[in-house]
Design a protein with these regions (language model features):
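AMP-forming adenylation/ATP pyrophosphatase catalytic core
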Residues: 38, 120-128, 132-367
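ATP-dependent adenylation/nucleotidyltransferase module used to activate substrates
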Residues: 1-151, 162, 171-172, 256, ...
């Protein structure tokens, strides 16, 4: 049995320290740099610089570095779904699909062809092993935990994966990198999706989706303006609505509360805590369980977006594999297309795409 481990080296400090720790543990470490998006002429995607940084890390650690492009697979398996969801008026999370289809799909298969016994990443999460099998747990650093993005990966793939920085705080990761002389110890963390980069999101989306203007309306049907297309907005959004002060309305900001696809209308409300922004429950698509599927209702914690605090809820499984999740407290801006991820303590049980939400009554939202 080989003791080779392939580490996904992104050019950032987290994966660099993951490689460092594994080498210190005696593994035969190889780095793998993945290009998942063709860098454009505007320079928003930083893949070229990231590769140079990954190469510098590999040189410092004296480990081989393999470079491979999964751009075609990414476009087919992740980006096309991303566009289709936006066309349908939903708000997808491509990072979840990227982990399932690319990092723990084609990249893991590629690592095995390179003779790896294990695959490793710089994710802030923990894989724990028990007699019952592998489990996905939150990272020690709650502020950096990335288990939300990993819930859709098959547990047998996670079982063969090492995530050595999941036990560390971010500050300790940077300190280890500095002590080891890794050139990326002070590199800024990447933000957003590579193919969007630092550019305005709607500017990027407009390169692929045509405008489809329609009415911006109040819940009572009053026309408040014109939107560019439902694909360019998400629930809870405040910026970019173009609604100023209006006679007969309070001096409060406007927020997107709902998308009416049948009429191509964007429904907006005033006030951050308007009741129409809150949901008491949601319905999911097919649940992806990281352990045996639950058959009976049970109490759990749920996140409906990354970095959200755990929310107390009850999950009711359905015979078709979907579920209904009802919240102890109303949740703001629960968004179809995003993911509801389920936890028991620090353990991630799985999750699913949010399909529909149930509005909360004005009385309960104010409670």
């Amino acid at each position: 049995m080989t003791d080779r481990v392939i580490v996904g080296l992104s050019g950032g400090v987290d994966s660099a320290v993951a490689a460092l720790l594994l080498k210190e543990q005696g593994w035969d470490v190889h780095g793998l740099f993945m290009s998942n998006w063709e860098e454009d002429e505007d320079g928003y995607c930083t893949a070229a610089q990231d590769f140079q940084d990954a190469r510098a890390v590999a040189r410092e650690l004296v480990i081989p570095l393999h470079r491979v492009s999964f751009a075609a697979e990414y476009r087919e398996r992740v980006f096309q779904h991303f566009l289709a969801e936006h066309r349908a008026g939903r708000t997808p999370n491509p990072d979840v699909l990227c982990n399932r289809e690319i990092k723990f799909g084609v990249a893991l298969s590629y690592a095995r062809r390179l003779g790896a016994a294990r695959f490793a990443t710089g994710h802030y999460a923990r894989i724990l092993h028990s007699p019952a099998g592998a489990e996905l747990h939150k990272a020690r650093d709650a502020a950096k935990d990335q288990s939300y993005f990993l819930h859709a990966v098959d547990i047998e793939y996670l079982a063969d994966t090492l995530m050595p920085i999941g036990e560390l705080e971010k500050g300790a990761v940077r300190e280890r990198a500095r002590e080891a002389g890794l050139p990326v110890f002070d590199k800024r963390d990447s933000t957003g999706i590579c193919f969007v980069g630092e550019r305005p999101f709607r500017e990027f989306l407009g390169r692929f989706l045509a405008d489809r203007p329609g009415a911006i309306e109040s819940p009572e049907g009053e026309r408040m303006g014109t939107h560019r297309g439902l694909a360019f907005y998400t629930l809870g959004q405040r910026e970019g609505l173009g609604i100023g002060g209006r006679p007969g309305h309070a001096e409060l900001p406007w927020f997107v509360a709902r998308k009416d696809g049948a009429r191509n209308a964007l429904i907006v409300v005033q006030g951050h805590d308007h009741p129409l922004l809150f949901s008491s429950a949601l319905s999911t698509g097919a649940m992806h369980w990281l352990s045996a599927a639950r058959r009976e209702p049970f109490s759990c914690a749920v996140k409906v977006r990354y970095r959200q605090a755990d929310q107390a809820a009850t999950l009711e499984p359905h015979d078709d594999g979907s579920a209904r999740i009802s919240f102890e407290k109303p949740q703001r801006a629960v968004t179809p297309g995003q993911y509801a991820v389920v936890y028991e303590g620090d353990r991630c049980l799985g999750g699913a795409v949010i399909e529909n939400v149930e509005a909360v009554s004005a009385r309960r939202a104010a409670a």
